[in-house]
């Protein structure tokens, strides 16, 4: 039997509503979970800098950022998967070769988020942290992640082929593609977290909605897709709950809290040890 020790949340489209806020109901339920001994974690493709407002609000025990390239516990780095200055320049040059000199690019570093934006991103999303404008001409920094806006799937495929040593995932809500080290995925970051913190992956409940979340949901003891998730995520998750605008996470955790005796069996089913029977109830937070 396995109990839940860590609740792990993607941000955009999952923990965040469409207006890029966390609902008071969700915050209240998460506080209750923490009081009962659950660890709280964030697993996001945002850079740490662009998630700062939510990090301050949630105070997560575990932070996975830049799509898995960074893992922090408190102020301690547990895992980093960085590109060298030379590798970063090669990636930028490849993006411009395939997509043109005017293509929009973002780069995450440990300390900042760089973007050759055409429109200030904070005018579109006020939750977005500070982005430093650069034309990338003389960019010389180590990096965690590159994102490129690519409107043509053929060109996206060409860039993926040129950067075959990278992990590439598209974000479903636009035309952006993320490139990280092959070893920098959310699921790899979870395994690194487990190794350091003494947690087993089957003791984690993870929530997500997009392509980058699929591996994470499949790895953890229970992978939960939001009602607004893309179909590929719903099809690979253990269960689907309400949407991010319907307090889906809060409703799930509230119901889970009603079944105090339910535990995860090793195969992901739920068993009620008090009654000695397998339950059809879909919620568990022992």
Where are these regions (language model features)?
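Mg2+-dependent phosphoryl-transfer enzymes with acidic/Ser/Thr/Gly-rich catalytic loops
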Residues: 2-6, 17, 23-24, 178-259
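Active-site neighborhood of HAD-like aspartate-dependent phosphohydrolases
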Residues: 2-7, 11-57, 259-286
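Active-site metal-binding loops of divalent metal-dependent hydrolases
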Residues: 13, 68, 209-210
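Active-site phosphate-binding/coordination module
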Residues: 19-121
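Short active-site oxyanion
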Residues: 37-41, 60-61, 144-146, 202-203, ...
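Substrate-recognition/cap helix-loop segment adjacent to the acidic, metal-dependent catalytic center
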Residues: 46-64, 150-168, 286
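A structural signal for hydrophobic residues in beta-strands of small regulatory alpha/beta folds
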Residues: 64, 79, 240-241, 270
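Conserved acidic, metal-coordinating active-site core of Asp-based
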Residues: 94, 98-207, 211-219, 228
């Amino acid at each position: 039997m396995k109990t839940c020790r860590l609740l792990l949340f993607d941000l955009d489209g999952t923990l965040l509503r469409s207006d890029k806020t966390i609902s008071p109901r969700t915050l209240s339920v998460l506080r209750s979970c923490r009081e009962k001994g659950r660890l709280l974690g964030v697993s996001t493709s945002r850079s740490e800098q662009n998630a700062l407002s939510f990090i301050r609000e949630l105070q997560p025990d575990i932070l996975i950022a830049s799509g898995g390239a960074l893992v922090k516990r408190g102020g301690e780095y547990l895992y980093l998967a960085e590109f060298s200055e030379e590798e970063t320049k090669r990636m930028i040059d490849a993006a411009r070769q395939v997509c043109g000199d005017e293509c929009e690019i973002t780069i995450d570093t440990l300390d900042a988020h760089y973007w050759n934006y055409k429109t200030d991103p904070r005018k579109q999303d006020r939750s977005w942290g500070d982005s430093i404008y650069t034309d990338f001409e003389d960019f010389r920094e180590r990096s965690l992640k590159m994102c490129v806006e690519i409107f043509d799937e053929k060109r996206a495929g060409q860039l993926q082929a040129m950067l075959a040593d990278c992990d590439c995932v598209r974000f479903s809500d636009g035309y952006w593609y993320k490139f990280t080290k092959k070893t920098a995925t959310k699921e790899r970051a979870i395994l690194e977290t487990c190794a350091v913190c003494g947690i087993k992956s089957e003791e984690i409940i993870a929530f997500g909605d997009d392509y980058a979340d699929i591996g994470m949901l499949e790895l953890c003891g229970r992978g939960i897709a939001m009602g607004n998730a893309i179909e590929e995520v719903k099809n690979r998750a253990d269960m689907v709950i309400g949407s991010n605008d319907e307090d889906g996470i809060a409703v799930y955790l509230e119901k889970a809290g009603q079944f105090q005796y339910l535990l995860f069996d090793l195969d992901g089913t739920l068993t009620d040890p008090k009654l000695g029977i397998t339950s059809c109830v879909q919620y568990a937070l022992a």
